[in-house]
Amino acid sequence: MTASHSLALSMTKSTSPLILTLTLSLQPPLKHPRKRETFQEIQAYPNAEVISLSPKSLMATNRFFCEICNKGFQREQNLQLHKRGHNLPWKLKQKTNKNQVKKKVYICPEKSCVHHDPARALGDLTGIKKHFSRKHGEKKWKCDKCSKKYAVISDWKAHNKICGSREFRCDCGTLFSRKDSFISHRSFCDVLAEESSKFFSVPSPLAANSTIATVTDTNNPILIQSQLDQSSTGTADLNVNNNHTTLFGQKFTNSNPTQQQPNALALSSPPSPRSTSDSVHNLWKLQEEECAHQWLLNEYMNNNKNIFHKGIFKNQEDEIKKGNIYSGSNPTDGNIASLFSYNQEAVNMASFSATTLLQKVAQTGTPSSSETSTTMFGQMTSSIFNNTMLNSYCLTAKNNEEELTRDFLGVGSSEDQQRLHRHRFPSSVPLTANHDIPKLAATIVGRKQP
């Protein structure tokens, strides 16, 4: 006898209800079979008769027919009752304890189905019919509201009763009739939306480009539109309004020197190796697009000289003569530099490629025609030439219409170009109208011309 049993016997001698309660609690709990095991025990019929019906006979509406009128019945009992009307001998099956009827189970006629195994057979003829229709049959019944199809008419009727009464709509537009399905889908949809927002929130380094759009003046608004192929050349914005100039996503403000902000390059933080490599890659992409934009603007200004108002760049011209725009503390210098690079070190890393391009210019010689100038302009992507030409287009203008359009290098014969050259190349030779392009390129790269 175990210790637990002896404890129980000693406690039963007392009549105290508390001790009796303790005695009952010490009894070992009864083990109840799990639902899965109970289901398997019910479905398992070791002595049952296994019946295999063909798909045709299984899906037949009537399996029993009258010999006289050929009327069909689904059950044999109904046929026997029908025979009484024809005065035929009929007999109903009666249950007796003497002759025990074997249980009948039905297997699925589809060999690949799990219920084709006799151990997984279904014990109801109606159940095997519905199973075969749902899993292997044709769905003939369609809901008029949600267009769902069903193979069993009872399922279709049950669906019609609740269809449209309860709807759970997700933000993505999906409808659910069950709340659990909606909750599981919503959790997945929220995670997907969060990841998508993180992806699209990353700013693109080339996002500052848009269509060459507007040149506005206070008195004479002029709209210039140029249709560009956005997939190949990108877009750019040029907005001039009084003392504010916006070019290719960068804003320049011409104000007094006392109101100027610190240089953008001076405020930039030291770059990391990864950001420096990205800056070099984005530098050349921006320069290639900039060349295309400036060439288009040049061509458009040559063809439409008369549409520009002569006083549209007056403020910029006055500032050039005063020497404010190209002063060392002007934020325009930093803004123009930041247009082509994120910091000064990125420009220095790209100097090797610029030197190679300048050597090509020195070898090819001076362009002799406008076509050659256009070709040479497309080849030169150095930030030196791009910045020079950018300033000549956007920050200078003359009363003479012929001087509105600068050459592609921006090295005109005006005194403003001399100031521009001294600002950009303080240690180089002075720039004059008689300078040759190969000599200029050779001077920059340190090559001596014969």
UniProtKB/Swiss-Prot annotation:
Positions occupied by motif Nuclear localization signal: 128-135
Signal peptide positions (record): none
Location(s), subcellular: Nucleus
GO molecular function terms listed in the Swiss-Prot or TrEMBL record: DNA binding; DNA-binding transcription factor activity; zinc ion binding
Assigned keywords, A-Z: DNA-binding, Metal-binding, Nucleus, Phosphoprotein, Repeat, Transcription, Transcription regulation, Zinc, Zinc-finger
Binding site for Zn(2+) 1: 143, 146, 159, 163
Polar residues composition bias: residue spans: 248-263
Function: Probable transcription factor.
Protein name: Protein indeterminate-domain 13
